[in-house]
Each structure stands twice: as structure tokens, then as C-alpha cells.
């Protein structure tokens, strides 16, 4: 799972096997290690109700998706989910959860064997 943060925007991109695991288990998680005892954990979790939202607690980013959005996203060609979450200080956090597609140009060192086929490959 890829995590991209830019300003007040948070994006998760999931490979095919990660989408399958999320559909089956209701969660996927990954982390980035910064050294001994220091890591950033990020997770995508299915919840029964609510809205697409994110929390940050104790170095763990959790993005939650209600089943009514998660199920069709996992089981169809739907590319992504998007929401804006108020931060409580007059700002918003933009959330994106997307299926990870292969790049149109091959990049060295990039393993895309588990990525979704790019729909623009057939232009």
C-alpha cells in the first residue's frame, strides 16, 4: 500500500492483492520505519457505518471506509473513493483511496506485477 501526503491531502493506493485482502479481512496495514522504535503505521479499515474518514493517533494513520462504499469499490471497476474531512480549525483534509494502476512508462526499480492494468493502456 502506498501512502502519499501532500499538504492537507492524504492518498492511499492499493495493489490488487491488498484490495482483495481488504475485501476479505476488512483491513490492510503497512508501515514505514524511521529507526529503532520509530515507525509510521498506516491502515485502511472497513467500518459498518459512517463516512470515509481518517484519524492520527500515536503515530498511526487509520483511514476508515463504511461497508456501503467499500464493498462496491472492492468488487467492481470503480477506481477510487474520495471525501473531504473537516479538521475542526476551518480547514479540510482531502482523502483519496485508489486502486494502484501500472504506469504508462516503465520505471526502473518499480515492481508493478501486482498493480491493476492501466485503463489508458488501450488508447
Locate predicted features:
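C-terminal charged interaction modules
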Residues: 80-123
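A hydrophobic alpha-helical transmembrane-helix feature that marks the membrane cores
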Residues: 9, 13, 54, 107-109
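Mid-chain, well-packed structural core segment of small domains
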Residues: 50-87
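Short, structured motif recognition centered on aromatic/hydrophobic residues
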Residues: 3-5, 10-14, 61-65
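Acidic (E/D-rich), amphipathic helical modules within compact regulatory domains
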Residues: 3, 12-13, 19-20, 26-32
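Short, surface-exposed beta-strand-loop junctions and turns on beta-sheet-rich folds
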Residues: 18-21, 69-71
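A low-complexity, Ser/Thr/Gly/Pro-enriched, surface-exposed linker/loop concept
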Residues: 26-47
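Residue-level detector of beta-strand structural context in well-folded domains
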Residues: 1-3, 52
Amino acid at each position: 500500500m502506498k501512502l502519499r501526503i501532500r499538504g492537507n491531502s492524504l492518498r492511499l493506493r492499493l495493489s490488487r492483492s491488498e484490495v482483495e485482502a481488504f475485501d476479505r479481512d476488512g483491513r490492510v496495514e503497512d508501515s514505514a520505519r524511521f529507526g529503532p522504535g520509530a515507525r509510521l503505521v498506516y491502515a485502511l479499515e472497513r467500518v459498518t457505518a459512517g463516512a470515509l474518514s481518517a484519524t492520527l493517533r500515536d503515530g498511526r494513520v487509520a483511514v476508515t471506509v463504511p461497508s456501503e462504499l467499500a464493498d462496491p469499490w472492492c468488487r467492481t471497476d470503480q477506481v477510487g473513493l474520495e471525501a473531504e474531512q473537516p479538521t475542526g480549525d476551518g480547514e479540510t483534509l482531502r482523502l483519496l483511496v485508489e486502486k494502484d494502476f501500472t504506469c504508462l512508462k516503465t520505471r526502473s526499480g518499480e515492481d508493478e506485477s501486482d498493480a491493476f492494468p492501466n485503463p489508458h493502456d488501450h488508447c
